[in-house]
Curated annotation (Swiss-Prot):
Succinate binds at G194, H389, T401, E402, H528, R569, G572. The gene is fccA. This is Fumarate reductase (cytochrome). Disulfide bonds: none annotated. The keyword Iron applies. Monomer. It comes from the Bacteria.
Length: 596
C-alpha cells in the first residue's frame, strides 16, 4: 500500500521527469500510473481476483490512505474557488465516483455544471442511455444460474423515496438491500432546494401560521388541474405533518417555513435560514438508513423484476458495474427510481415542445424504474404531463429554488418589466417566461432576500448572480433599461405597502425591495418533473395493466409514480411525496415480506 509520503514522491518524480524533458510516456489512466508505481496491489486485493464489490470499498480505502478523505480534501481546497471536493452531494462520496482506474476519470459535477476542472487523467463527461433489456442473452444466463443472495425487501433507488422506504422497512424488521445505479446516492432529492409542504405542523403553530390539511388537499388538486387521484392526495396531506415529525425525530431541521407557488398558506418547511431542503433531508435519511444496517450498493442497476408463474414478484436481476449480472431473491420490491426528465428522447416523445430542453435533474433520471415495471406488467398514467421549472440558470446549470420568489423576488423581462404573478404555478410561470424576448427572464431581489435564504449563497459562489449598488447600476449589469427597471421596482414596492398587487394579483407580498445591494440572475425554463408514472394505491402497491389489481409484492414511491400531482406539481410537494409515500412503501413491503 502507498503511504501518503510515497504517493507524493511518485507524483513529484512524474512531474519532474516531464519538466526535465526526460523521454517518458505519460500514463493515460490511473491504473497505468498506479501500475508503474506500485502494481495492482496498490488498489486491488490481488488474491481476490479483482474488485470485491460494486461500491469498490477496498479500492476507495486505498485512495483515502494515500490522498485523504473528502473532508480533508475539502478543507485543503481554496476557500474562494469552486472545488469538486466541497459539494452539495450526500452520503459517503467515494473517490471512484469520479476518479476511474481503467478509463478516463470524469468529474461528476460536469453532469450538471461546466466548471472546467483540470482533472488528472481526466476525460469529457458523457452518458449514453442503455436500455434495461440490452444484452438479453447474458441476462437470461444469469437468471438460469440461480439465486446469488436472498433478502426480505429490495429497494430500487437511493433518492428520498428509496431512503425513506429503507428506514421504514428496517424499522419494521425487514432485511433490506438498496440498489442504486449511479456512483453517487441521493437521486433528485439531493438537488431539491425549496422546501417540504406540510399542513398543521408544529413549526407552523410556533410561527402562528394557520393552515389546514384540507387546504393543502385543495391547493394540490387545483395545481394538478384536478386530474390527481384524490385518495392519493388525501394521504399526502393527511400524513404530511407526521412526516415532518418523523424527519425531525431523526435529526432533521424543518423549522423555517415559507411559501411556494400555488400554495394558499406558508407551508414549505426547510432548515433554519432557508437552506436547501433536499440535501439536508437526503443526508438525514442516508445516515439513518446506514445506522439501521441497510445494505446499500452503488453502481448497481436493476435491469429486470423477476416474477413466478402466478405473477408474484420473486426478486430482481442486477447488473453490477464491476461484478456483472446476478439475481437477488426478495419477497417484496420497492421501485423508487425517480422519473425520466434527464432522458430528453423520452420526454419529447410525450411532449414534443420540450425537445432539446435542458433538465434540472441528476443524470440517473432516465426512466429505468418505469422500464422494469412495464416489463412486469405495471399500469401507468399521466405520462404526457411533464413539468418545466421556470427558474433554471443557463449559466450555472442549476435550478434556482422557488423560495427566492417566495421570499419576495420579482421576475422581469429584457424591457425591465414584470409580466406575471411570480408565485403562480410552475406551468403558468414557465409558459409566461417562454413568451418573453430570448425565452428567458431575470430574477431581481435585494440584500434582505439574500440574507433570508442561505441557498442564494450557493448561486453567488457559482458566479451567476449580478450585483449593483443601486437598481440603475444593476440594470446596466443585466442590460435592461435602467429607467424601466427602477419604475418597475418602485411600483412593486408600492404594492407591498398597500398589500395589493394591482398588476398581477400576486397574493403574497413579503417585503419591499429596498435594501442595497441589489441582485439579479438570468432564468429560463428547464424540464424538471415528470408527473406521470406507475399507478399505485394508498398502500403504495403497484397495479397491473392487465387486471387493475395490485401486482403481488411490488410497491413504488416518489416520482416514478403517477396520480399524486396530476397535470402539474406544486413546489414543495415533491419532498412531501417522497417522504410520505417512501415511508408507506417501505412499511407495506416489510409487512408483506413478514406475512409471506
Amino acid at each position: 500500500m502507498f503511504t501518503r509520503k510515497i504517493q507524493k514522491t511518485a507524483l513529484a518524480m512524474l512531474i519532474s521527469g516531464a519538466m526535465a524533458g526526460t523521454a517518458y510516456a505519460a500514463p493515460e489512466v490511473l491504473a497505468d500510473f498506479h501500475g508503474e508505481m506500485g502494481g495492482c496491489d496498490s488498489c486491488h486485493v490481488s488474491d481476490k481476483g479483482g474488485v470485491t464489490n460494486d461500491n469498490l470499498t477496498h479500492e476507495n480505502g486505498q485512495c483515502v490512505s494515500c490522498h485523504g478523505d473528502l473532508k480533508e480534501l475539502a478543507a485543503a481546497a481554496p476557500k474562494d474557488k469552486v472545488s469538486p471536493h466541497k459539494s452539495h452531494l450526500i452520503g459517503e462520496i467515494a473517490c471512484t465516483s469520479c476518479h476511474k482506474g481503467h478509463e478516463k476519470s470524469v468529474a461528476y459535477c460536469d453532469a450538471c455544471h461546466s466548471f472546467g476542472f483540470d482533472m488528472p487523467f481526466g476525460g469529457k463527461w458523457e452518458r449514453k442511455f442503455v436500455p434495461v433489456d440490452a444484452d438479453k442473452a447474458a441476462q437470461d444466463k444469469a437468471i438460469a444460474a440461480g439465486v446469488k443472495e436472498t433478502t426480505d425487501v429490495v429497494i430500487i433507488g437511493s433518492g428520498g423515496a428509496g431512503l425513506a422506504a429503507a428506514v421504514s422497512a428496517r424499522d419494521a424488521g425487514a432485511k433490506v438491500i438498496l440498489l442504486e445505479k449511479e456512483p453517487i446516492p441521493g437521486g433528485n432529492t439531493k438537488l431539491a432546494a425549496g422546501g417540504m409542504n406540510a399542513a398543521e405542523t408544529k413549526p407552523q403553530a410556533k410561527l402562528g401560521i394557520e393552515d389546514k390539511k384540507q387546504i393543502m388537499i385543495d391547493d394540490t388538486m387545483k395545481g394538478g388541474r384536478n386530474i390527481n387521484d384524490p385518495e392519493l392526495v388525501k394521504v399526502l396531506a393527511n400524513n404530511s405533518s407526521d412526516s415532518i415529525d418523523w424527519l425531525t425525530s431523526m435529526g432533521a431541521d424543518m423549522t423555517d417555513v415559507g411559501r411556494m407557488g400555488g400554495a394558499s398558506v406558508n407551508r414549505s418547511h426547510r432548515p433554519t435560514g432557508g437552506a436547501g431542503v433536499g440535501a439536508h433531508v437526503a443526508q438525514v435519511l442516508w445516515d439513518n438508513a446506514v445506522k439501521r444496517g441497510t445494505d446499500i450498493r452503488l453502481n448497481s442497476r436493476v435491469v429486470r423484476i423477476l416474477e413466478d408463474a402466478s405473477g408474484k414478484v420473486t426478486g430482481v436481476l442486477v447488473k453490477g458495474e464491476y461484478t456483472g449480472y446476478y439475481v437477488i431473491k426478495a419477497d417484496a420490491v420497492v421501485i423508487a427510481a425517480g422519473g425520466f426528465a434527464k432522458n430528453n428522447e423520452r420526454v419529447s416523445k410525450y411532449d414534443p415542445k420540450l425537445k432539446g430542453f435542458k433538465a434540472t435533474n441528476h443524470p440517473g433520471a432516465t426512466g429505468d424504474g418505469l422500464d422494469v415495471a412495464l416489463q412486469a406488467g405495471a399500469a401507468t398514467r399521466d405520462l404526457e404531463y411533464i413539468q418545466a421549472h421556470p427558474t433554471y440558470s443557463p449559466a450555472g446549470g442549476v435550478m434556482i429554488t422557488e423560495a427566492v420568489r417566495g421570499n419576495g423576488a420579482i421576475v422581469v423581462n429584457r424591457e425591465g418589466n414584470r409580466f406575471m404573478n411570480e408565485i403562480t404555478t410552475r406551468d403558468k410561470a414557465s409558459a409566461a417566461i417562454l413568451q418573453q424576448k430570448g425565452e428567458s427572464a431575470y430574477l431581481v431581489f435585494d440584500d434582505s432576500i439574500r440574507k433570508s435564504l442561505k441557498a442564494i449563497e450557493g448561486y453567488v459562489h457559482l458566479n451567476i448572480v449580478k450585483e449593483g449598488k443601486t437598481i440603475e447600476e444593476l440594470a446596466k449589469q443585466i442590460d435592461v433599461p435602467a429607467a424601466e427597471l427602477a419604475k418597475t421596482v418602485t411600483a412593486y414596492n408600492g404594492f407591498v405597502k398597500s398589500g395589493k398587487d394591482a398588476q398581477f394579483e400576486r397574493p403574497d407580498l413579503p417585503r419591499e425591495l429596498v435594501v442595497a445591494p441589489f441582485y439579479a440572475l438570468e432564468i429560463a425554463p428547464a424540464v424538471h418533473h415528470t408527473m406521470g408514472g406507475l399507478v399505485i394505491d394508498t398502500k403504495a402497491e403497484v397495479k397491473s395493466e392487465k387486471t387493475g389489481k395490485p401486482i403481488t409484492g411490488l410497491y413504488a414511491a416518489g416520482e416514478v409514480t403517477g396520480g399524486v400531482h396530476g397535470a402539474n406539481r406544486l413546489g414543495g410537494n415533491a419532498i412531501s411525496d417522497i417522504v410520505t409515500y417512501g415511508r408507506i412503501a417501505g412499511a407495506s413491503a416489510a409487512k408483506f415480506a413478514k406475512d409471506n
